[in-house]
Amino acid sequence: MKQFTYTVKDELGVHARPAGLLVKLAKKYSSKVTLEKNGKTCDMRKLMAVMGLGIKQGETITVTVEGEDETVAAEEIAAFLNENV
């Protein structure tokens, strides 16, 4: 299992565009990818679940990746967040 935290920098937070791209990225991997904010957890492969967390600028999220390709998945998701959110 790989886990990391990220503090959202984008002033709009995780809105529709980055949420959609995150879901698309998570679906590339066979590993289970979850996103957590303030104790609420969701499957990162489900757009409405990700949007439902209402992630805003300055909030910290935790990403957990578990499965065969967890290392590469965690690295790519972390890179995406750093570049886009």
Q: What are these model-predicted stretches?
A:
Residues M1-T5, T60-T62:
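Intrinsic-disorder/low-complexity, polar/charged segments enriched in Ser/Thr/Lys/Arg/Asp/Glu/Gln
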Residues T5-T7, L81:
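Compositionally biased, low-structure terminal segments
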